[in-house]
Amino acid sequence: MIIAVDGMGGDFAPELVVEGCIQAVKEYEGIHIIITGKKELIKNELDKREYNGNKIEILNSEEVISTNEAPVKAIRRKKDSSMVKALELVKEGKAQAVISAGSTGALMAGATFVLGRIKGINRVCLAPLLPGAKAPFMIADAGANVDCKAEYLVQFAMMGKVYFESVLGVKSPTVGLVNIGAEEEKGNELTKAAYKLLKDTDFNFIGNIEPRDIPRGEVNIAVCDGFIGNTVLKTYEGVASNLFSMLKKEIMASTRGKIGGALLKPVFKDFKKKFDYTEYGGSPFLGAKGICIKAHGSSDAKAFKNAIRQAKICYDKKIIEEIENNLGNLIENNI
C-alpha cells in the first residue's frame, strides 16, 4: 500500500511528519510512503535519522497552503502545493490514501474537488473519533457541511456505521441524532425529517440524544449537521483542555494537594491518556473517492504514525467499497 503524506502540513512540519513516517514504516508491514513538500527541507530531516530508503520517497512541491487562505481558491490555484500533490497521487491511483495536518478547509475542498465523491454520496463528511466515558464515539459531521438536508444525515450515519463495523470491529454500532431533547417531536425541521428517515433504516438508531450524553459514551455515532457538530467538538476539546489545567492548578495550590497529586500520578497519567488525540490518529473524510485522513494541526510523530496505521486499516478493510455497498442498500430501500 502506498500512502501520500503532506510533508508541509501542521504546526511541526516537516520535522515531526518525517519522524512519524519513519516510525510507521518500521512498525507496519506492507506500506510505502511518499512525502510531498519542499524536497530540501524533507531530505534534511530524513538525513538526520536512520530509515529504510526503499520505503520512503519524496515528491517535490514548492508551494504550501496556509490555514488563513480561502480553502477552495487555495486548492484550485496552488497546484504545486504539498497538499494538492498528495491528493493528486490518490486521484491518479499512484497512492491509496492521503494524510495531512494542514488546513482542514483546504483538505475538505481537496477531498471534494480533487478526489471527488463516491457516486451517490451527497456530501463528504468529517468524522473525528473522540474518547468517551464508556468507549470512543464519532461525530458525523464535525464541520464539513454547515447546511444539510435530512438525506445527508442518513448518509453520514451510514458511513459512520461502516467505519465502526469495518475499521473498529464494532458490530451494530449505536446511532443517535444530536438534538435539544430526547423526544421525537423535538428540534427543527432538519432533525424532525432526519429522525423519520433514520427510524426507517436498519441502523441501530436509538433516537435523539442531547450533547451532554455524547461524552458519556451513550452512543457510538452522533449524527448532526456540521455547524452543530463543530460546536460540540470545539466545546468538548475546550472543556477537556481546561479540566486538566484547572486540576493541575488546584493540586499545586497546597502541600496537601501536591502530596495527593503525587500519590495519584499513575491514575492521572492513565486518565490523560484516554483524552490523548494522538492515540486516534486523525479524522477521516468519509464519502470521498479515496481514503483521506485529517491529522490534528498540532500532531506529533506519534499522531502521524497512528494516522498512517488508521489509513492502512481503512485500506485493508476496503472502507470505500463497504460504503458503496451500504449506499446501495439505502437506495434499494428508497432512503
From Swiss-Prot:
This is Phosphate acyltransferase. GO terms for biological process: fatty acid biosynthetic process; phospholipid biosynthetic process. HAMAP family: PlsX. Pathway: Lipid metabolism; phospholipid metabolism. It comes from Clostridium botulinum (strain Langeland / NCTC 10281 / Type F). Keywords: Cytoplasm, Lipid biosynthesis, Lipid metabolism, Phospholipid biosynthesis, Phospholipid metabolism, Transferase. SUPFAM superfamilies: Isocitrate/Isopropylmalate dehydrogenase-like (SSF53659). InterPro entries: FA_synthesis, Phospholipid_synth_PlsX-like. The lineage of its organism: Bacteria, Bacillati, Bacillota, Clostridia, Eubacteriales. Homodimer. Probably interacts with PlsY. Its EC number is 2.3.1.274.
